[in-house]
Amino acid sequence: IIDQPNLMIKIPATKAGLPAITEVIAAGISVNVTLIFALTRYAEVIDAYQAGIEKCANPKSVHSVASFFVSRVDSAVDKLLNDDSLKGKAAIANARLAYELYLEKFKNFPHNHQRPLWASTGVKDPAYRSTMYVDSLIAPNTVNTMPPSTLDAVIAAVIEAEDTITPNIQSAKDELLALAALGIDLNKITDELEADGVDKFMTSWDVLLDAVEAEIQKAK
């Protein structure tokens, strides 16, 4: 048993995962809720976390992050666009509105906040600025996990730690409306991204189990 206070277990933000989040948080176990793409699902994740921590015997000991996947949204949306001016906009706009939802839902919440975590923040399109998903998503109480190459780019860029989300929430709404006007169904896209993410997780889990079983057999 690792038994470290900063350890979190991962639970995917699927419909089936929501009650598990509540139950595990209520049991006093810290959780990284992962594979979040849609704002509607993020709202359900927050509700699941808050329901769990309200039942927890020692809520001060429990922490959680909600991992909102960023660059995959742009990868899916951009290939549907002919309008270059809207390429590279969907993911950041989506994340900024997620932060607005975080502020609303936790405004008067008395226990530890479930912090938004920006995941998948390495750019997939080489035409984009390498720090785009970092310097565009800075705000209090957020976390950003990034690959080493992106971290190196951030260090080299000497990015100022100023809020780049809340001043741009209205523009984020405008960008998503513009995408919807072009027929981009973001809900459909995020549903597909979630399903694909779960498939990848299951494949990784099966590979891990096979590797563990192989080592057990070797040790016999």
Enumerate the predicted regions with their spans:
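Catalytic cores of alpha/beta
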Residues: 18-25, 44, 130
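Short catalytic-loop micro-motif centered on adjacent basic/acidic residues
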Residues: 7-11, 31-35, 188
